[in-house]
A protein has these predicted regions:
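Boundary of Sec targeting at the N-terminus
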Residues: 27-28
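Bacterial N-terminal signal peptides
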Residues: 12-24
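N-terminal secretory signal peptides that target proteins for export/translocation
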Residues: 1-8
Length: 198
């Protein structure tokens, strides 16, 4: 019985210490400045979209990744030392960009309540790239990103809650493939490290 009382006192003492430490930490934390106001769902999604589209922060955005590429460079596919397509980098920057445009346009359509057709296979979202339309493709990529950002900006809160995970996933998808574009450009020798990635 005496052991139980000692355990209760130790437990109570630990709770008091925990509460005291928590209050002390909170009291020492400065109030956020106006630029550090808490994020809303909308502002967090817009920040994600911009960081993968046109705002260099943690990584190189897609607009920078495709800037300055010629149509000829955009169709280049890495080959291994035997002259075969490298299985670790089997897409050109153009194919990767076409894939990004396809899926971002698909997501935009769904956000607008449309029912865009899904591809028969994901391969066709890469393989339908035509180097003759490279400049148009780069413009479409920029425009679809602006359109998605505008939709998120104006969307009612209840609808935004329904599409939030899709918007977050397309941002992650964009960052992933932008990294691949940079990898291919580095292999090709067409990437300028001054643009963000050494």
């Amino acid at each position: 019985m005496a052991t139980m009382r000692v355990m209760h006192r130790v437990f109570a003492f630990n709770i008091v210490l925990l509460v005291t430490a928590s209050v002390t930490l909170v009291a020492q934390t400065p109030s956020p400045s106006p630029s550090e106001t808490p994020a809303t769902l909308r502002s967090a999604l817009l920040a994600e979209l911009h960081s993968t589209h046109d705002k260099a922060e943690w990584f190189t955005p897609m607009n920078t990744a495709v800037a300055g590429l010629t149509a000829e460079q955009a169709k280049w596919i890495p080959h291994n030392s035997q002259g075969k397509v490298d299985q670790n980098a089997n897409h050109s920057t153009g194919m990767l960009t076409h894939h990004l445009v396809f899926w971002n346009e698909n997501v935009l359509g769904r956000m607008r309540g449309e029912k865009p057709a899904d591809p028969k296979t994901n391969d066709e979202t890469f393989n339908d790239f035509d180097a003759a339309h490279w400049n148009d493709l780069v413009q479409r990529l920029d425009q679809v990103m602006k359109n998605i950002e505008a939709e998120v900006e104006k969307m009612p809160e209840e609808k935004l809650l329904k599409v939030a995970s899709t918007v977050s996933h397309i941002s992650t998808h964009n960052a992933y493939h932008t990294g691949q574009i940079l990898y291919v450009r580095k292999l090709q020798g067409s990437w300028n490290p001054a643009n963000g990635v050494k």
